[in-house]
Structure formats: C-alpha cells, structure tokens
Amino acid sequence: MLWQAARLRSEVNAMLTRKMDGDSMLFYEGNTLVLAVVETDLDGGILMALQGELRSELAHHIQDELDAFTTVGVKVTVDFKNVTFVSASALNALLISQQLIDSLRQGQIVLRNIPDATYRKMDEIGLTELLMIED
C-alpha cells in the first residue's frame, strides 16, 4: 500500500516540469503553466511573487526557496496577489519554513495579498497567529 502511494506521488511529480527563466521558476503541466515564482529585490530582501496554483506537489519547491533565503537571514515577502489556488500542503510548507526561522532566530517571511478564501482557511486553523501577514 505504501509503495502505491509513493508510485502515485512519483507519477504526479513526473507530470510537472520546472524551468528556470532569469529570476523566475516556472512549473508546467504539459504545455500549461501551473505556477510562476518570480523573485526580485525588495528593500534589502526578496519579493517572491506567485502566479497560478500553489498545488501540493509544488509545496516543497516553495519551502526550499524560502528556506534558502531565510536561513541566511534574508527577509522574504511572498505575494499571493495572482494565486488562484492554495493547497493545505502549501500552507504547511509556509508553517515549516516559519518554524525554521523561529529556531534559527534569523530571516523573516511576510505574506501579502492573500486571497480571502485562503485567509479564512488560514484563520480557521490558526495560521494567521503564527505567520506574519501584511495588510
């Protein structure tokens, strides 16, 4: 049973392709762009603008990017303005990155432009108390 779950996860990940384009990470399913992650400088930190669907199978990519910056003390502002879907796994990835920051006592993650439905879900499960959210 466990091997079937691992095989299914592998097949799902195999359908997505990651491409780098300058300061952008682009994730495709076939020829369809699923998620774009565009990173730019922002007041001594990084702005990570997301566009598209933050699916479960992409959560670890976002977490890896956040951790790479925050473990060296960089502030990362994550902009959800153009996000159309956020999975529970993606929310968990944000929480795990925040816990790493808390343990290292360096770096910072700030979330902004969170869609109303996502904010309500985050509030229901207590994430709005644990994560820094900019109005």
What residue ranges belong to the model's regions?
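Non-catalytic signal-transmission and effector/linker regions of two-component phosphorelay proteins
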Residues: 2-38
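Generic N-terminal initiation segments characterized by hydrophobic and/or small/turn-forming residues
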Residues: 5, 13, 30-32, 47, ...
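A broad, low-specificity signal for short, low-complexity segments enriched in glycine/proline
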Residues: 8-14, 36-41, 54, 69-73, ...
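STAS-typified acidic loop motif
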Residues: 25-63, 82
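Feature targets compositionally biased, intrinsically disordered low-complexity regions
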Residues: 21, 29, 43-44, 72, ...
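Intrinsically disordered or low-complexity boundary/linker segments at protein termini
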Residues: 134-135
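Amphipathic alpha-helical interaction surfaces in cytosolic regulatory modules
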Residues: 56-131
